[in-house]
Amino acid sequence: MGNGERGRPNKKMKYGGKDDQKMKNIQNAEDYYDDADEDSRDGEGEEKKRDFTKLELKPDHGNRPLWACADGRIFLETFSPLYKQAYDFLIAIAEPVCRPESMHEYNLTPHSLYAAVSVGLETETIISVLNKLSKTKLPKEMIEFIHASTANYGKVKLVLKKNRYFIESPFPEVLKRLLSDDVINRARFSSEPYYGGDGFSVGRTCGELEAGPGELLNEAEFAAAAEEKETHSFEIDPAQVENVKQRCLPNALNYPMLEEYDFRNDNVNPDLDMELKPHAQPRPYQEKSLSKMFGNGRARSGIIVLPCGAGKSLVGVSAAARIKKSCLCLATNAVSVDQWAFQFKLWSTIRDDQICRFTSDSKERFRGNAGVVVTTYNMVAFGGKRSEESEKIIEEMRNREWGLLLMDEVHVVPAHMFRKVISITKSHCKLGLTATLVREDERITDLNFLIGPKLYEANWLDLVKGGFIANVQCAEVWCPMTKEFFAEYLKKENSKKKQALYVMNPNKFRACEFLIRFHEQQRGDKIIVFADNLFALTEYAMKLRKPMIYGATSHIERTKILEAFKTSKDVNTVFLSKVGDNSIDIPEANVIIQISSHAGSRRQEAQRLGRILRAKGKLEDRMAGGKEEYNAFFYSLVSTDTQEMYYSTKRQQFLIDQGYSFKVITSLPPPDAGSSLSYHSQEEQLSLLGKVMNAGDDLVGLEQLEEDTDGMALQKARRSMGSMSVMSGSKGMVYMEYNSGRHKSGQQFKKPKDPTKRHNLFKKRYV
């Protein structure tokens, strides 16, 4: 779904349902080798190249913009006059793999086709338009794959009625097939009020007209049909909704659930008096993303992917204003909560008493029957003991039927802790917003059943050319290690301090200081310096006398520093730890200097770039090739000949796939900088080295925030060696006694287990 799972296309197309005979008819990639070409694969049968000589070009192929290959890959020429229409179509049916300036690569997957049908595209429409745009005749295998992936979509719906979940279908035989699965059968409640002959509750619902081929490219909404259809349904346990949706995906039972909210005909939940203000004018790509979400008078659950700074907030507020029901908005931190509350008031007519914030510092409630609650994932997912006031608010959240669940930075939802919010809160429609649909722990595909399919994804370079986001110059600055630092870096006993050594490299410090001076004094820019390593963050900020924000910084102090950075001419540089990666809106910043990072995280690299992507200046100056070719700068400082070089290359992959290129700079600071910069003399460098080596291992590590397996996926398990000296406080640690709570005062310790009752595998340990 995101770059985390799509990365590069599979060599063979993968299919979903096991019992669909169409799946078995699709040929293997064997047909696309030249039998005479012995070099087409290596000794293990791995494919090296393919023979596409069997593809027949159409006579007017020069006027058609794309190539369709039998393995599911599609290549689009961006210089074609039909590029815009072809892009809008491809982004609806396929996953983007790589989108450089001249040629895009896409990949058809079961999930991408599931998303296509969910926004109203019929199977025959997809095949017909692909054939019209393709330079060659569509391969038979691709046609069969499209049929197989879309055959069952729309046959099953997940419906929320009066805080109860029902699986609904006009086909009772489909429900029987679902109930033959153990997971779904266990999740069923058997308390339906009215049963048909098959044991399902029977009701009636309005049908709807399907889209024709002529309605595809002009985005026409589908008209609702008047006839009624008989539907069959059964109720499922709300706690099992996630598991049931997962079992219905294309890679399992292949009956993807349709989640639509007929909000205009919802007379049960109270309406929210909320409209967009006249000055809220969504841009063309924002309108397009909303048109994918709303169709046929209904709201679809799913994900919208827009670059940082491209106006995701306006999309979210517009969706809430269109549904006009109670909305629960989830953000990643308290600063982001304040910003979202501000965005709702900025773009909509919502009154102050209709919107409230729920954080550790602010526990508000809206007045009336409907309103907007803005809170964090942590506040909702927290499983520990709460204050009485917080418990009441959470209970209200659980008992309310939310019209819209709006999730910012939705890529964090697959984390074990955050995905709880999906089961805790009940909502008719879920909208996820993100700039980076990518994770390193391969959980990004979980969003298909946690939230829904990807509805729309914008192309970064198109928005740059349109002047909607900043035109960024990306550069990788190579900083040679000093010989003293490199000697310590190579020692085996310093394995835990390797990162601190290459981050505190004096040449890197000097390059950072030079860039700050250049952009502050000669260009008057606003600069953000990112460092994941807290030891380095503190040393850099203290030495250069700049404000810093990290995990332990209070909310009040964060707000004060950010406000000074935005408004004061005296505060032009701020140091941020990883807390600044997500959901902090700093539109004034136009320079980023990254001195340390979280291993090879592609998502973090893109999120940090996004801090400076908001458009700057007048529109005519923002257009690519306007007054300034580049109006924002992203520097990644890397110590050469260290592990950081490998991580840097891996981190850049997502941005390269979006069409960005990295310039390599090897001569910073310039030779004439001399003693004007810090750590010029060897004595200063040795003093810094001593400070790094004398710091405890716990002080030179990465900042630890809320647990997310995406970050853990980049780390290896480590074994630490201790000594009795740490107990005396020689490394900043002290010995403390405490009661864990398991044995209260006056209670006796539990007797050890009888050795004869131990399992055979463990008996020998107690001999």
UniProtKB/Swiss-Prot annotation:
Start and end residues of each stretch annotated as Disordered? 1-51, 742-767
Which gene specifies this protein's sequence? XPB1
Organism the protein comes from:
Arabidopsis thaliana
**The protein's assembly and partners:** Component of the 7-subunit TFIIH core complex composed of XPB, XPD, TFB1/GTF2H1, GTF2H2/P44, TFB4/GTF2H3, TFB2/GTF2H4 and TFB5/GTF2H5, which is active in NER. The core complex associates with the 3-subunit CDK-activating kinase (CAK) module composed of CYCH1/cyclin H1, CDKD and MAT1/At4g30820 to form the 10-subunit holoenzyme (holo-TFIIH) active in transcription.
UniProt keyword Repeat present:
no
What residue stretches are annotated with the Helicase C-terminal domain? Answer: 510-676
Q: What is this protein called?
A: General transcription and DNA repair factor IIH helicase/translocase subunit XPB1
Q: Where is this motif: DEVH box?
A: 408-411
Pfam families listed in its UniProt record: ERCC3_RAD25_C, Helicase_C_3, ResIII
Q: Where is the composition biased (Basic and acidic residues)?
A: 42-51
**Compositionally skewed regions (Basic residues) per UniProt:** 758-767
Q: What is the lineage of its organism?
A: Eukaryota, Viridiplantae, Streptophyta, Embryophyta, Tracheophyta
